[in-house]
Swiss-Prot record:
EC identifiers of the protein: 3.1.-.-
Broad EC category: hydrolase
Protein name according to UniProt: Endoribonuclease YbeY
An example Gene Ontology molecular-function term: RNA endonuclease activity
Organism name: Spiroplasma citri
Names of required cofactors: Zn(2+)
Binding site for Zn(2+): 120, 124, 130
Length: 158
């Protein structure tokens, strides 16, 4: 069975230039983590208002987050893998306005920022976090490896 990785764009922002990167990151993370079972994952591009509403409703936070993840595996009572043949990971929401603003703030390309946010979100949804220094080092090293291997580098914009 094949992976079911779907990108939904709920905005007018033109996301097509980033789709190849999202697919490459998805595959690179599977390879690096030796994930062999087929995965199901949704990436949803939203605007600031929708991201704020998601953050308020589900995380009780009153700000626009750059990326929010909703992992199915940690809350699932039934084994969806047995039902579907797919390991259902959940949903990653990226706020395109926040991504563009952060790219400008950090003086690198929107491509790099979208790739970073998707990588960060996918690692979170797979159980990685940065709550302790050791966990942070592990997660951030993996993020750097994914982006470096795909040559999506932090090149300053002039």
């Amino acid at each position: 069975m094949k992976d079911d990785f779907v990108i939904y764009n709920e905005t007018d922002f033109y996301i097509k230039p980033y789709q190849d990167d999202f697919n490459a990151i998805f595959q690179k993370i599977k390879t690096l983590l030796a994930i062999t079972e087929p995965l199901e994952l949704s990436l949803i591009i939203v605007d600031a208002q929708e991201q704020l509403e998601l953050n308020q409703k589900y995380r009780h936070k009153d700000y626009v987050a750059d990326v929010i993840t909703f992992a199915l595996e940690e809350e699932n009572k039934i084994d969806l893998f047995e039902l579907t043949g797919l390991r259902s990971l959940g949903d990653i929401f990226i706020c395109y306005e926040k991504a563009l603003a952060q790219a400008a703030e950090y003086n690198h390309s929107p491509r790099r920022e979208f790739a970073f946010l998707f990588t960060h979100g996918m690692l979170h949804i797979l159980g990685y976090d940065h709550q302790t220094p050791a966990d942070e080092e592990k997660m951030f090293n993996l993020q750097r490896k994914v982006l470096n291997d795909l040559q999506i580098n932090r090149i300053p914009i002039k």
